[in-house]
Amino acid sequence: MATHSSFTATTPLFLIVLLSLSSVSVLGASHHHATAPAPSVDCSTLILNMADCLSFVSSGGTVAKPEGTCCSGLKTVLKADSQCLCEAFKSSASLGVTLNITKASTLPAACKLHAPSIATCGLSVAPSTAPGLAPGVAAAGPETAGFLAPNPSSGNDGSSLIPTSFTTVLSAVLFVLFFSSA
């Protein structure tokens, strides 16, 4: 239980950072070359539906199956735009979250949902990672990776600076709301 409570205690802060950086990465997507097509919806709000998945996909997590509203949140994300799952994985390193790639890639199967392969996300994953493993099947060891966000192009015109300021203010408001209700 101590592991679950430590994830619960960090969830509000994680969500705020995730919202901030996801908004910036989605708004700045036109400046980057990506393998996966750009999502057609605002992923930052959709990803919040997957907050309970953090304990399952985080490196060092001991949760054997998705908890709480993880699967229903994942279903919501996949129904709206499956590319938002890629956005969540891509932004994980910039949020300070190290993913267990093996478990993250089995999340849809663990929730009995169909999702595009993690390979379609255009992520730099070690070749030894086994995204096709069935839930409950472990590789030689837990594989982890922090995905690096792409470097901004040299032609960045700074157009994402205004949305970043708005996102920062929105994040601060959410931060206060989360901690004042706790």
Swiss-Prot record:
Alphabetically ordered keywords of this record: Cell membrane, Disulfide bond, Glycoprotein, GPI-anchor, Lipoprotein, Membrane, Signal
Glycosylation is annotated at 100
* Predominant cellular place of this UniProt entry's protein: membrane
> Where is this protein localized, as stated in its record?
Cell membrane
Annotated Gene Ontology cellular component terms: plasma membrane; plastid; side of membrane
Task: Please verify whether the record's keywords include Endoplasmic reticulum.
Answer: no
Q: Does the keyword Chloroplast apply?
A: no
Q: Phenotype upon knockout? A: No obvious defects in morphology. Plants lacking both XYP1 and XYP2 have morphological defects in vascular development; e.g. discontinuous and thicker veins with the improper interconnection of tracheary elements (TEs).
Q: Where is the lipid attached (GPI-anchor amidated aspartate)?
A: 157
Query: What GO terms describe the biological role, i.e. biological process, of this protein?
Result: lipid transport; xylem development
Matches recorded under SUPFAM superfamilies: Bifunctional inhibitor/lipid-transfer protein/seed storage 2S albumin
Pfam families, per the entry: LTP_2 (PF14368)
Signal sequence, start to end: 1-28
Task: Specify the protein's topology with respect to the membrane.
Answer: Lipid-anchor; GPI-anchor
- By its UniProt entry, which InterPro entries does this protein fall under? Bifun_inhib/LTP/seed_sf (IPR036312), Bifunc_inhib/LTP/seed_store (IPR016140), LTSS (IPR043325), Plant_nsLTP (IPR000528)
Q: Specify the propeptide location in this chain.
A: 158-182
What is known about what this protein does?
A: Probable lipid transfer protein. Proteoglycan-like factor that exhibits xylogen activity consisting in mediating local and inductive cell-cell interactions required for xylem differentiation.
Q: Provide the family line.
A: Belongs to the plant LTP family.
Protein known as: Non-specific lipid transfer protein GPI-anchored 31
Q: What is the lineage of its organism?
A: Eukaryota, Viridiplantae, Streptophyta, Embryophyta, Tracheophyta
